[in-house]
Amino acid sequence: MAKDEKWGIANIYSSYNNTIITVTDITGAETISQWSGGKVVRADRQQASPFAAMAAATRIADDAKEKGFVGLHIRVRAPGGNGHRSPGPGAQATIRALARAGIKIGKIEDITPIPHDGTGRPGGKRGRRV
């Protein structure tokens, strides 16, 4: 990593309903670009698909290159809390698409919020009765 190379942070929020990608500078203070699966596909049911995530990632890569970024550190987040702890189908597709677009990939970290014995899951004592 040379001194004159410009790096940023790509925050990927991937749920089973959508994938949202936000690129910030290395401090995280200034947002460079933001795209989601819902912005690039027409049907709501396709928002969370890997195709939508790849399309959003290529637009993110173009915006980042335009601003002079050479590489991105990746921060992947799932809904977490009382929801799913694993990211949706768009997370892996996003990272692959960024790498294919010519962006260098730095650190990849998982920032999913995990409760440390907070509130209980919805459903009550006996669970959801169907």
Curated annotation (Swiss-Prot):
PROSITE patterns: RIBOSOMAL_S11 (PS00054)
GO molecular function: rRNA binding; structural constituent of ribosome
A Pfam family per the record: Ribosomal_S11
Intrachain S-S bonds: none
InterPro entries: Ribosomal_uS11, Ribosomal_uS11_archaeal, Ribosomal_uS11_CS, Ribosomal_uS11_sf
BP GO annotations: translation
A cellular component annotation (GO) from this entry: ribosome
Entry keyword set: Ribonucleoprotein, Ribosomal protein, RNA-binding, rRNA-binding
Region feature Disordered, mapped onto this chain: 109-130
Oligomeric and partner information: Part of the 30S ribosomal subunit.
NCBIfam families in alphabetical order: arch_S11P (TIGR03628), PRK09607.1 (NF007176)
Free-text function comment from the UniProt entry: Located on the platform of the 30S subunit.
Family membership: Belongs to the universal ribosomal protein uS11 family.
Name of protein: Small ribosomal subunit protein uS11
Classification of source organism: Archaea, Methanobacteriati, Methanobacteriota, Methanomada group, Methanobacteria
